[in-house]
From Swiss-Prot, chain B:
Keywords: NADP, Oxidoreductase, Porphyrin biosynthesis. This is Glutamyl-tRNA reductase. NCBIfam families: hemA, PRK00045.1-3. Its EC number is 1.2.1.70. During catalysis, the active site Cys acts as a nucleophile attacking the alpha-carbonyl group of tRNA-bound glutamate with the formation of a thioester intermediate between enzyme and glutamate, and the concomitant release of tRNA(Glu). The thioester intermediate is finally reduced by direct hydride transfer from NADPH, to form the product GSA. NADP(+) binds at G189, A190, G191, E192, M193, C194. It comes from Pelobacter propionicus (strain DSM 2379 / NBRC 103807 / OttBd1).
Length: 267, 436
């Protein structure tokens, strides 16, 4: 059952991504409408698949790379639908849905057997840690996309290229605003995720902090970059181009943390 | 009945000809009345704008009607028909419907998608309705044209982008600053172009206006006009940080705003973006300002480029508009053809009724001891015989009208029953349509 919904999701996300990518090149309002319908349908299928798996295993589906990537993708699409609704920026889909699709394709390529983590590691701190981490990742993914769009639009404005894409991209202010809102959602969640992770690590019989755990170290680097960005925005008024570049750097480090570094405890 | 169009536009006639043929709106009553008093012209509307003069009319005789309207145009403006004719175009039936739908939808305009033409046709129709020179057909026709124009406007993006430099500036500012409400505009110098752009910004939601002019009094006058604030030219850089949008057009022989001035201002504004438009020649603002963070500088040439790109986009959208027009022509044409059959139906019914009445009276006259009850029954019986007999032909004619094959049937019926459709029938028809 969850598998059926999972494959539905894969197909629907694929269709939506295709539609959004064509929308980059062709200006048809109908295309954006259908892309939005597809991604919404995909989100519902994805949600059902995730809930079903959670009920089946009796735990949050965040225990393996397959599950984590799928959840990451779900969170990205959820965040996208939220921001698309509140800002009415269809073109955002052209930048975000490919990322969600990549995540779910990667997830589908990994073994999907149900793993039961050892009872010592089962703790509300762990679930809270994983959940908050992925929601913050999704928020940062949106920041990444709007930052890329910002840089592109700024390039068009500075170089006076007034093509079809320039027309479709929203104003610099809107993209900066979305970036900032995602940062204010993502950063506190990332902070809480790191704290709850540390507490959980103690519960599991380790230390609060383990410098030998590269994932922990890289998480800290990610945290510092986003902290610097938030600080710069709040005090000296960093915005626009500067903020966009730092957001992109933060996202790259985040990806390294997520994919490149194995957790010393679970994986 | 046929719809015909005779006219000239920016596509066929130079401005010297157009202005000679134009009708003045406050003197439109006489030409309208003259138009419908022409032989076999039953309804007429005159549209006259600076880009086109067109006459819409209905007639039974296409060739004759068209020739009479051409003659009318020439005579009215005292131009020899031989010299006017080369500029005139004429359409009838389906082509006429297409033409008017396209004109109303602004697909035939000089600037495709410009919104004025629809209002101008509405005004022209308003005069015709006021002086009762438009009737059933043109009323319906023009209302249809208005609804087609509305469809084109809402279903395509034909009018979604700016095609004037001042509007392009507003559009561009929105791409940088987002919502313009609460934004402040600063005018440096008081050129006409700047003034126009400022007006557009203020109607688009910008809140404050600052005017820095070398002659303070002139700046004050302009500021007062828009409810803004004049600032002494020497204090320009102290006040520049308040402006989100800067429009510059001084007659200065060298640049007056240097990159380092803007750099300081941008820092003071905590990198809130600033939008500069330099309209002056030679330039007022150093082009290197554009390379600074959060500063975006545009010249008139840049704006002109946007206007051209938007025009190209409009022309692309126009093809979608043409498709909508084609769909609507078919529908209207059907209605027009079904109209053909209606006067025949009315006349046929009148003929039958006339016979029934005459025969009934003849019968009742020689029948003395008839009870009122029986008289009533006879009346009902004859009426229902007549209705039953007429039912099928009426239905067939109406169907034929929708398929556009009315002539065959109406001609046959007119001959067989010796019918004459008159002006009175048209009036009845009009009542019938109004009831609809």
């Amino acid at each position: 059952m969850s598998k059926f919904f999972f494959y539905c999701t894969l197909v629907l996300y694929g269709g939506a991504t295709l539609a959004y990518l064509i929308y980059l090149l062709r200006t048809t309002p109908l295309l954006a409408t259908w892309a939005h319908r597809l991604i919404s349908a995909g989100f519902i299928a994805h949600l059902l698949s995730t809930i079903h798996r959670a009920v089946l295993t009796g735990q949050l589906p965040l225990t393996s790379m397959h599950e984590s990537l799928s959840f990451f993708s779900l969170a990205i699409v959820g965040a996208f639908i939220f921001f698309e609704r509140s800002y009415r920026v269809a073109i955002l889909g052209s930048f975000v849905t490919p990322l969600a699709l990549l995540a779910i394709i990667a997830s589908s390529a990994l073994p999907d057997e149900i793993r039961h983590i050892s009872p010592i590691l089962r703790s509300n701190w762990f679930w809270g840690h994983a959940l908050m981490a992925f929601i913050s990742y999704a928020a940062f993914t949106i920041t990444f996309a709007t930052s890329a769009m910002y840089l592109l639009q700024e390039h068009f404005l500075k170089r006076k290229r007034f093509g079809a894409l320039f027309r479709k991209l929203p104003s610099l202010e809107i993209m900066d605003d979305i970036s900032y809102r995602c940062l204010t959602i993502g950063f506190p969640l990332l902070t809480l995720a790191i704290i709850s992770g540390a507490i959980w690590s103690v519960q599991a019989g380790g230390n609060y902090w383990n410098w030998a755990d590269r994932k922990q170290v890289w998480s800290m680097i990610t945290w510092f970059i986003y902290a610097a960005l938030l600080h710069g925005r709040l005090t000296t008024g960093w915005r626009g181009r500067r903020a966009a570049l730092l957001s992109i750097l933060g996202f790259i480090v985040l990806l390294i943390t997520f994919f490149g570094m194995r957790h010393s405890v679970t994986w | 009945m046929n719809i015909i169009v005779v006219g000239l536009s920016h596509k066929t006639a130079p401005v010297e000809v157009r202005e000679r043929v134009a009708f003045s709106p406050n003197l439109i009553e006489r030409p309208l009345r003259e138009l419908v008093s022409l032989d076999d012209i039953s309804e007429g509307v005159i549209v006259s704008t600076c880009n086109r003069v067109e006459i819409y009319a209905t007639t039974h005789d296409i060739a004759g009607g068209t020739a009479r309207i051409k003659r009318f145009l020439a005579d009215h403006h005292r131009i020899p028909l031989e010299s006017l004719e080369q500029y005139l175009y004429s359409y009838h039936s389906e082509a006429a419907i297409r033409h008017v739908f396209r004109v109303a939808s602004s697909l035939d305009s000089m600037v495709v998608g410009e919104p004025q033409i629809l209002g101008q046709i509405k005004t022209a129709y308003g005069y015709a309705a006021e002086y009762r020179t438009s009737g059933t057909i043109l009323n319906r026709f023009l209302h249809k044209a208005f609804s087609v124009a509305k469809r084109v406007r809402t279903e395509t993006r034909i009018a979604s982008s700016a095609v004037s430099v001042a509007f392009a500036a507003v559009e561009l500012a929105r791409k940088i600053l987002g919502d313009l409400s609460g934004k402040t505009v600063m005018l440096i110098g008081a050129g006409e172009m700047c003034e126009l752009a400022a007006k557009h910004f203020l109607t688009s939601g910008a809140r404050g206006l600052l005017v820095a002019n070398r002659t303070f009094a002139k700046g004050e006058r302009l500021a007062a006009e828009f409810g803004g604030e004049a600032i002494p030219f020497e204090e320009l850089f102290q006040e520049l940080h308040r402006a989100d949008i800067v429009l510059s057009s001084t007659g200065a022989p060298h640049t007056i705003i240097a990159p380092r001035d803007v750099e300081a201002v941008v820092k003071r504004r905590k990198f809130k973006p600033m939008f500069f438009i330099d309209i002056a020649v030679p330039r007022d603002i150093d082009p290197r300002v554009n390379d600074l963070e959060s500063a975006y500088l545009f010249t008139v040439d840049d704006l002109q480029e946007i206007v051209e790109a938007n025009m190209a986009q409009r022309n692309q959208e126009a093809s979608k508009g043409e498709e909508i027009v084609e769909q609507e022509i078919g529908q209207f044409h059907c209605w027009l053809s079904s109209l053909e059959s209606t006067p025949t139906i009315v006349a046929l019914r009148a003929r039958f009724e006339e016979i029934r009445r005459a025969e009934l009276e003849k019968t009742l006259c020689g029948w003395k001891d008839l009870s009122p009850e029986a008289e009533k029954r006879l009346e009902i019986m004859t009426l229902s015989i007549m209705n039953k007999l007429l039912h099928t032909p009426t239905a067939v004619l109406k169907r034929a009208g929708q398929g556009g094959r009315t002539d065959l049937y109406t001609d046959a019926l007119r001959q067989l029953f010796d019918l004459q459709t008159s002006r009175q029938d048209d009036d009845e028809l009009e009542l019938e349509l109004e009831e609809e």
